[in-house]
Amino acid sequence: MAAKEVKFGEAARAKMLNGVNILANAVKVTLGPKGRNVVLDKSWGAPRMTKDGVSVAKEIELEDKFENMGAQMVREVSSKTADVAGDGTTTATVLAQAIIREGMKAVAAGMNPMDLKRGIDLAVEAVVVGLKGISREVANSQEIAQVGAISANSDKVVGDMIAEAMDKVGKEGVITVEEAKGLETTLDVVEGMQFDRGYLSPYFVTNADKMLVQMENPLILLVEKKISNLQQILQILEGAVQSSRPLMIIAEDVEGEALATLVVNKLRGGLKVCAVKAPGFGDRRKAMMEDIATLTGGVLVSEDVGVKLENVTMDMLGMAKSIVVTKEDTTIIDGAGDHEAIKARVNQIRAQIEETSSDYDREKLQERLAKLAGGVAVIKVGGATEVEVKERKDRVDDALHATRAAVEEGIVPGGGVALLRAREASLTNLQGANHDQQVGINIVTRALEEPLRIIASNAGAEGSVVVNRVVETKETNFGFNAATGVYEDLVASGVIDPAKVVRHALQAAASVAGLMITTEAMVAELPKDEPAMPGGDMGGMGGMGGMGGMM
């Protein structure tokens, strides 16, 4: 086991605070509408420009191990906030730095660290209640657009695009962000259920120009197993011909005689038909097939439930308004399933999302939920250079998370004002059990001003003057609009934050800050003195002695 170095008390805390300050000072230059960019060096490729706090925090690794411990603990604040709320990472870092800085001073002055921590926790609980009191639900898509624009660094185009995407796919819908090939940032919306399986044979194509299959008012046969024998589906084919409706077959596979017969019937024009493989794999495939059955009002032909393919009747087939199949994917539009059944299925998937501990499973369940409940929207982010595209994609991701958070828990006035208003409502009469706890409450009281101070100073204003002006005016929504330099009603001018983001930034900051204030010893591995690499001898070059005559 390697030898360790141990630091105690004030010496340990000073090193830790140093690391906190280095990381927080690099992150906080990005805060607010007039925050600056940070350039991140990469071991390969071009440097990356970002205004995303968590991206900056993740890049910082300090040489001194004790300072690095402090930096990494604050990095944890921003990455935890990013994981839960998706935005507010810079605010969380600024709050953590302020609480740690004031807390360390109090410990150095002889306060009891445990009482300080209790005071901090009391204050944070009270402020969270205060935030709930001033938050309100998102009223319309304009407010969604405003939240998105603020998070994307006052980029109105991004805010509008996210609001439009949410409008089209619903609040449960999946919105993904991808890098585009061109200059334009675009929004593609897939309404209905789409899965990534295309037609089994190009002979099924009905639109030869676009190489796709289009079916209006089709019947849909859903089969869990492979179909290889024609006799199994003959009865269904005859029923489809008699009803003069196209037939869509979704099965594990269709092969041999069955596939050949379907193709021949399609080419002769007697039967409009198309076959695709079932989406997904293993257990997930069965679940997705059941989703499709619920959406279309059909029955999944599965031996598990005692339904054999030979015994399928026409009323077991699903229906939809239309289906479009390309080489790569299939889209079912406006399935004819019962709304109550779809709702029950959606609630069942929601319950599974709550229960699962795997991020991968959660993501796949979210996709299934979106396909049933709304649709899928893709924002393709464009730009002139790769560096610009990556920077813009960071901002769009932030904006997307922020708008989701706003829909979940409502909105509060932005620009660092919500924390001050919640402070007025909840900390004015809050009393700790003793003097040291009261100091902990006062530390939080002071720290809640910090985001507004930094936003103001990044915009070229004097932080203390701005804070005093905002605190003097008791109107909840009144604050400093750093983008325009005007004091005004922030909600009316569209400067709003999701309550969830502000709440989580404060809770994560206080959680880590409380732990760091109560630290009394730090242990790190001693750096190893690696001997220098021995120089190689000039073996084999001895014969070059005669080169002396070249002088």
From Swiss-Prot:
<dbReference type="GO" id="GO:0051082">
    <property type="term" value="F:unfolded protein binding"/>
</dbReference>
<feature type="binding site">
    <location>
        <begin position="30"/>
        <end position="33"/>
    </location>
    <ligand>
        <name>ATP</name>
    </ligand>
</feature>
<keyword id="KW-0547">Nucleotide-binding</keyword>
<protein>
    <recommendedName>
        <fullName>Chaperonin GroEL</fullName>
        <ecNumber>5.6.1.7</ecNumber>
    </recommendedName>
</protein>
<dbReference type="GO" id="GO:0042026">
    <property type="term" value="P:protein refolding"/>
</dbReference>
<feature type="binding site">
    <location>
        <position position="415"/>
    </location>
    <ligand>
        <name>ATP</name>
    </ligand>
</feature>
<dbReference type="InterPro" id="IPR001844">
    <property type="entry name" value="Cpn60/GroEL"/>
</dbReference>
<dbReference type="InterPro" id="IPR027409">
    <property type="entry name" value="GroEL-like_apical_dom_sf"/>
</dbReference>
<dbReference type="GO" id="GO:0140662">
    <property type="term" value="F:ATP-dependent protein folding chaperone"/>
</dbReference>
<comment type="similarity">
    <text>Belongs to the chaperonin (HSP60) family.</text>
</comment>
<keyword id="KW-0067">ATP-binding</keyword>
<dbReference type="GO" id="GO:0005524">
    <property type="term" value="F:ATP binding"/>
</dbReference>
<feature type="binding site">
    <location>
        <begin position="481"/>
        <end position="483"/>
    </location>
    <ligand>
        <name>ATP</name>
    </ligand>
</feature>
<keyword id="KW-0143">Chaperone</keyword>
<feature type="binding site">
    <location>
        <begin position="87"/>
        <end position="91"/>
    </location>
    <ligand>
        <name>ATP</name>
    </ligand>
</feature>
<dbReference type="GO" id="GO:0005737">
    <property type="term" value="C:cytoplasm"/>
</dbReference>
<dbReference type="GO" id="GO:0016853">
    <property type="term" value="F:isomerase activity"/>
</dbReference>
<comment type="function">
    <text>Together with its co-chaperonin GroES, plays an essential role in assisting protein folding. The GroEL-GroES system forms a nano-cage that allows encapsulation of the non-native substrate proteins and provides a physical environment optimized to promote and accelerate protein folding.</text>
</comment>
<feature type="binding site">
    <location>
        <position position="497"/>
    </location>
    <ligand>
        <name>ATP</name>
    </ligand>
</feature>
<keyword id="KW-0413">Isomerase</keyword>
<dbReference type="InterPro" id="IPR002423">
    <property type="entry name" value="Cpn60/GroEL/TCP-1"/>
</dbReference>
<dbReference type="Pfam" id="PF00118">
    <property type="entry name" value="Cpn60_TCP1"/>
</dbReference>
<dbReference type="InterPro" id="IPR018370">
    <property type="entry name" value="Chaperonin_Cpn60_CS"/>
</dbReference>
<feature type="binding site">
    <location>
        <position position="51"/>
    </location>
    <ligand>
        <name>ATP</name>
    </ligand>
</feature>
<keyword id="KW-0963">Cytoplasm</keyword>
<dbReference type="InterPro" id="IPR027410">
    <property type="entry name" value="TCP-1-like_intermed_sf"/>
</dbReference>
<comment type="subunit">
    <text>Forms a cylinder of 14 subunits composed of two heptameric rings stacked back-to-back. Interacts with the co-chaperonin GroES.</text>
</comment>
<dbReference type="InterPro" id="IPR027413">
    <property type="entry name" value="GROEL-like_equatorial_sf"/>
</dbReference>
